[in-house]
C-alpha cells in the first residue's frame, strides 16, 4: 500500500507543473527579423509599399484599399479578392498607456479567453515574436484558430514609435491564400513594417 501511495505522489509531482504550464497564457517571446535596410526581392515581387504617417508597411499587390467595412474603422484597410485583410491604425501613447509587452499580453489574453456570452472560439496555436527593424522594437502576436473559425489565422504587429503605438492586423484563411503566396511570406510581409525617415 505504501508503494502505491508513493507512486501516486510521484505522479502528481510530475503532472502538476505540466498542468500549470497548460493554463499559463504568458507569451513566449523570441527575437527575429533584424531589418537593417536589406532589399528583399522575393517580398517586392508580391507586395506594394504603403504609408500611414511615418509608418511604412507592405500589402499584397492585388489588394484594394477599403473604407467603412466596420463601424469603427480608422487608419488604412486593404483587402484582396481572396479575403486577405490588412489593417493599419495608430493611437497616442501617454502616461496612462500600458507598456508594449503588457499590450501584447492583453491581446493574447483577449484572444485566448473568450467572453462567456459568445460561442467558444479558441485558437489552436498562438505565438509571440519580437521583431527588430532597424532598432525599432515590435511584437508580433500570431493566432491560428480552430472551429468554428477553422483555417483562420490572425497576426497583430504592435510597434511603439515617437509617442505613438502602431497596429498592423493581418487576417487570412489558410485554405484560401492567393495563388503563389505562402503563409511564411505573409508573416514576413507584416514583420517588414518599418518607419520612413524622409
Predicted regions: what is each one?
Residues 7-16:
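Bacterial N-terminal signal peptides
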Residues 19-85, 149-151, 169-198:
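N-terminal targeting sequences that direct proteins away from the cytosol to non-cytosolic compartments
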Residues 163-168:
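Short hydrophobic/glycine-rich mini-motifs in sensory/regulatory modules
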Residues 109-161:
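Signature of long, low-cysteine stretches enriched in small and polar/charged residues
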Residues 1-4:
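Positively charged n-region of N-terminal signal peptides that target proteins for export
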Residues 21-38, 97-120:
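Short N-terminal secondary-structure initiator segments
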Residues 74-106:
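A short acidic-to-branched-hydrophobic micro-motif
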Residues 92-94, 145-147, 174-176:
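Beta-strand elements of well-folded, non-transmembrane domains
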Amino acid at each position: 500500500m505504501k508503494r502505491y501511495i508513493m507512486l501516486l505522489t510521484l505522479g502528481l509531482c510530475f503532472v502538476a507543473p505540466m498542468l500549470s504550464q497548460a493554463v499559463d497564457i504568458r507569451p513566449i517571446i523570441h527575437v527575429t527579423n533584424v531589418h537593417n535596410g536589406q532589399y528583399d526581392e522575393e517580398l517586392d515581387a508580391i507586395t506594394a509599399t504603403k504609408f500611414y504617417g511615418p509608418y511604412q508597411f507592405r500589402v499584397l499587390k492585388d489588394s484594394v484599399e477599403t473604407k467603412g467595412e466596420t463601424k469603427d474603422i480608422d487608419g488604412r484597410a486593404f483587402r484582396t479578392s481572396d479575403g486577405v485583410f490588412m489593417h493599419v491604425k495608430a493611437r497616442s501613447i501617454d502616461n496612462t498607456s500600458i507598456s508594449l509587452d503588457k499590450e501584447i499580453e492583453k491581446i493574447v489574453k483577449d484572444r485566448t479567453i473568450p467572453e462567456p456570452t459568445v460561442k467558444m472560439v479558441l485558437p489552436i496555436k498562438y505565438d509571440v515574436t519580437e521583431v527588430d527593424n532597424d532598432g525599432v522594437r515590435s511584437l508580433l502576436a500570431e493566432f491560428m484558430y480552430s472551429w468554428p473559425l477553422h483555417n483562420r489565422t490572425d497576426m497583430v504587429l504592435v510597434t511603439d514609435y515617437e509617442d505613438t503605438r502602431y497596429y498592423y492586423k493581418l487576417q487570412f484563411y489558410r485554405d484560401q491564400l492567393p495563388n503563389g503566396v505562402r503563409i511564411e511570406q505573409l508573416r514576413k510581409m507584416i514583420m517588414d513594417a518599418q518607419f520612413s525617415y524622409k
